[in-house]
Amino acid sequence: DEQRAKELFEKGRKLAKDGRCAEALSPFQESLRYAEGVGTLLNLGNCYETLGKTASAHRSFLRAAEVASRNDDKRKDEAKERAKSIEREVSSLLIHVPINLKSSAEIRVDGEIWPKERWDVPWPIDPGVHDIEVIAPPRPKQTESVTVKPHGDKADWAVLTRDPATSPVPPPKSDRPKPDAKETGEESSPQ
């Protein structure tokens, strides 16, 4: 519904103008559900960029350029320029998946499925802490948090190649101190 999209866009724009970009995200995103507008995508990208979410901003600007191009909108060049201007600031996450798990593993990042086309390639992601979960039965679930830094960081993370539960375990260490030579009756000769 175009009217609802416009109302939400105006609400988001007012919040953004008041310096409340975090609050403006929701109305902009909801507006896009009703109608995908170039202005909404550009404003959403501006807010993401202000909040340091460079991968999300880049995606919004690229999408704005696509929509503008499709609709013969003069803002196409602006959207392309905005995307290009932050390209080097976009951080990425590279998740290495061993070949023996490629057919059975499911990977989630921040609770969302990480599709196989993202495996083993650097993928744009916003800076911050990201929770990674690997489910590959019969192995136990592997979970870990990875911090992706801002300003074009390239974070790497690898799925364990072996099941930690079945990996060889070193023998337990004894709590008893080793006996010295006097206790064992073995004296060293003074040679």
Q: Where are the regions that the model predicts?
A:
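Acidic, Pro/Ser/Gly/Ala-rich intrinsically disordered segments
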Residues: 1-191
